[in-house]
Amino acid sequence: MPIPGTERKTHQMKILSAEVLNLMHIDLDKREALIRDVVYEVMSGLDAPDLSDQIVVTYWINAQTLTPAEVGKEISYHMTSGVRKSPPGSLLDQCTGRVIDAVDFDDTHRMGVVRVGFPLKMLMDEGGNLYSTDIFHITAGEGVFGLTENIDVKLCHIAMSDDVLRLFPGPAYGAPGIRQITNWGDDVAFGTILKPCTGITPEEESEIIAQAAANPLFIFVKEDENYLPGVPFAPLKDRLTHANEAIRRVSDQRGDKGLIYAPHITAPPHILADMVKMCVDAGMNGVMLSEYFIGGAIRMVRELTKDLTNPPVIYAHNGGISVRTRHIYREVLDLFTRLDGGDFRQTAPLTNGSSLLRPFGVEWKHCEYELSRPLAGHPPVMMARAGGLDQGNIILNLLDVANGAGIANYLFLAGSAVNGIKNPLGEYDPAIGAEAMRQALQVYRDGVFTRIDASHIQDLKSYAYQNGLQALSTALAQRYHI
């Protein structure tokens, strides 16, 4: 027993004033949604800018003393030539930004939208290449976000001409290519994530891989992002050896359906290229990484593998993105992930209640738009609806995509909804989770539910019970405690 008075206090309270608490309790998601709605409304009424020699960036501004137009001039000054006035037609002039236009939001003239043009002359390299790292280095630098004059700034949109968009490599495959190389046709594409997330040996992981790879429901299987490639108990090279063996061992159970397997390779820049080469040498047809703490990593992998006959599919994981999206809109980051070469990109599933993960609402719609819209010949990304996707909301998501863009550009990616379902012995049994997902898909195909309401989970559970869909009934009971 600890000596009285020496126990560590784990719960304490500090009394704060109502004013401080009110500021701390601001609903930032609600605020972001309101700002985004107004920004897009304003943008829709602006004239199309001249993009022949510049990219045009839209910022939302909340300043202390300057108008949005004046803030735009400061951004141009600090982040382009650093010259207030340049000789017309000079090289200096060609490397100096311009304010295109501005819209004030109130009579204080301190809040609004401004569009700033950044010259291509100062952004392109000597080979005529353009890089997202350089674009963000300039358009989202400290001369934008670090100035104390600016209470809050958001980078909302970057407009580029088709000629500029074609300077980027884009996805090697995208959704159409992924379906082609796996012989998936127009079937619904499901994927799963290996669990446990970490703390397993290559031998243990191989058994989990074999279970998933044997199931022709899945077009895609990936490691979890928590399973770092350099851990001593499971170094990547050993994992690849065992993964290959596991996939080969069960390949005859897949019929004519291919499978993309993506090991996790996120690593520091001086190591990452070696990780990519290791995967290529091992014959891996996919890799997964997040670049938000390693700038430019997606483009690096794309460039490193572009001359291969069959480059690996890139699952551009978005781990770390939310630390940026209060200032750089997520849809802008997703656009550049597509341009840099990501083949898969997570958005988020629709759910029957509050979303587990961002994005949602208008942000979510714009992300899916940027990942799939016509883009100077670049293929659409295969969007992974993941993060809480399960048997209870899969029909909602299938109905949504069927009534919208169609299933072709979507991967329905479930982790714990497959690998976290237990059998009657209390053991985790991915086969039950996968079968439950297959049964939910069949319920959708049978047209049992044409719309989803508040009672959907209970209604689906009742239908599963009445029709002998034991796996689906079990999964819903465990996921929703019903």
Which sequence ranges carry the predicted segments?
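N-terminal capping/small domains of soluble enzymes
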Residues: 2-207, 211-213
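Glycine-rich, proline-tolerant flexible connector loops at the mouths of alpha/beta enzymes
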Residues: 218-240, 349-356, 422
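N-terminal active-site wall of soluble small-molecule enzyme domains
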Residues: 239-246, 251-255, 259-280, 297
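Catalytic alpha/beta core domains of metabolic enzymes, predominantly
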Residues: 272-277, 282-414, 432
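Extended, intrinsically disordered, low-complexity segments
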Residues: 425-482
